[in-house]
């Protein structure tokens, strides 16, 4: 018995020594293992490399540190710059009036020689595959529209309008004229819509299919229609009555397959274009030259 107790007491110091060595090994971190000469940091960089004098951050277990390191790895490139975001929307391409009468049809209403940026109202159309592309622009901060009518009068017309809302956006909406009022139609044939409000003008561009299923509120554009031109103010993104009592209209039906550049003088520039006015001027001139009897 005495011999067994002696052998046990000889093993105790050895066991204590092994236990202390194990505890010391558990307390050592991975970064400490590579801290000696020739060792490597947590990202594999040799201690002798450039930047060795910089302090290498230790990997803490807190959520904030983890989230920050995850962001660095997920959203930063190798050079440390953020990855590029989606490119911004392309700016609105300027309407090319030089193509009027050649590759697209145009209507200009306003001052003689005006263009898409100076006319009171401007519209262009052209065929692109199975669609018709329309471009509209008007001197207004509200809305600009074109109506497709079987006559020159408002009522029972298919209308496409570009509306400037309170958020600064220009939206393409579909309406159906009921008498003098425009009722919005949920079925909107417009596609590839874009619009802008600049220099107190509403300008937009969109495409619409040539052929559509038969419907009371939408017409087939492969047929010829009178075009009605209108524009006016908007309140909280809703259109109100147009600016002039009798909106201009095309003199004859319009075919989308025929490109013309048609100018229509506004009221301020058509005073002397009326035959009655011309006759009155001639009569007054003759009266002044001949004198009174």
Swiss-Prot record:
GO terms for molecular function: dynein intermediate chain binding; protein-containing complex binding. The chain crosses the membrane at residues 271-291. Residues 46-61 have a biased composition (Basic and acidic residues). Residues 119-234 form the DOMON domain. PROSITE patterns: DOMON. CDD domains: DOMON_SDR_2_like (cd09628). Keywords: Cell membrane, Membrane, Signal, Synapse, Transmembrane, Transmembrane helix. Residues 30-61 are annotated as: Disordered. InterPro entries: DOMON_domain, FRRS1L. Residues 1-28 form the signal peptide. It holds the Pfam family DOMON. The keyword Cell membrane applies. Expressed in the brain (at protein level). Coiled coil: none annotated. It is found in: Cell membrane; Synapse. One of its GO terms (biological process) is regulation of synaptic transmission, glutamatergic. Its main location: membrane. One of its GO terms (cellular component) is endoplasmic reticulum membrane. The keyword Amino-acid biosynthesis does not apply. Component of the outer core of AMPAR complex. AMPAR complex consists of an inner core made of 4 pore-forming GluA/GRIA proteins (GRIA1, GRIA2, GRIA3 and GRIA4) and 4 major auxiliary subunits arranged in a twofold symmetry. One of the two pairs of distinct binding sites is occupied either by CNIH2, CNIH3 or CACNG2, CACNG3. The other harbors CACNG2, CACNG3, CACNG4, CACNG8 or GSG1L. This inner core of AMPAR complex is complemented by outer core constituents binding directly to the GluA/GRIA proteins at sites distinct from the interaction sites of the inner core constituents. Important modulator of glutamate signaling pathway. This is DOMON domain-containing protein FRRS1L. It comes from Rattus norvegicus (Rat). The gene is Frrs1l.
């Amino acid at each position: 018995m005495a011999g067994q107790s002696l052998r046990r007491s000889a093993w105790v110091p050895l066991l204590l020594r092994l236990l202390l060595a194990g505890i010391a090994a558990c307390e050592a971190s991975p970064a400490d293992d590579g801290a000696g000469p020739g060792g490597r940091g947590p990202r594999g960089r040799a201690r002798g490399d450039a930047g060795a004098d910089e302090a290498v951050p230790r990997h803490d277990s807190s959520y904030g540190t983890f989230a920050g390191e995850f962001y660095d790895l997920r959203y930063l490139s190798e050079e440390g710059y953020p990855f590029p975001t989606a490119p911004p929307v392309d700016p609105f391409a300027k309407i090319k009036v030089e193509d009027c009468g050649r590759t697209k049809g145009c209507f200009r209403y306003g001052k003689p020689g005006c263009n898409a940026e100076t006319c009171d109202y401007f519209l262009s159309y052209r065929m692109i595959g199975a669609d018709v592309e329309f471009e509209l622009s008007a001197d207004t901060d509200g809305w600009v529209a074109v109506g497709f009518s079987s006559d020159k009068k408002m009522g029972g017309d298919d209308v496409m309008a570009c509306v400037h809302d309170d958020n600064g956006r220009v939206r393409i909406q579909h309406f159906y004229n009921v008498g003098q009022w425009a009722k919005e139609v949920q079925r909107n044939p417009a596609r590839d819509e874009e619009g802008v409000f600049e220099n107190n003008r509403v300008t937009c561009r969109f495409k619409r299919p040539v052929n559509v299923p038969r419907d009371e509120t939408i017409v087939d554009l492969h047929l010829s229609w009178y075009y009605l031109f209108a524009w006016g103010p908007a309140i909280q993104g809703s259109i109100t009555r147009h600016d002039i009592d009798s909106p201009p209209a095309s003199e004859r039906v319009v075919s989308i397959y025929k490109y013309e550049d048609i100018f229509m003088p506004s009221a301020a520039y058509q005073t002397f274009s009326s035959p009655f006015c011309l006759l009155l001027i001639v009569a007054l001139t003759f009266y002044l030259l001949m004198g009174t009897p």
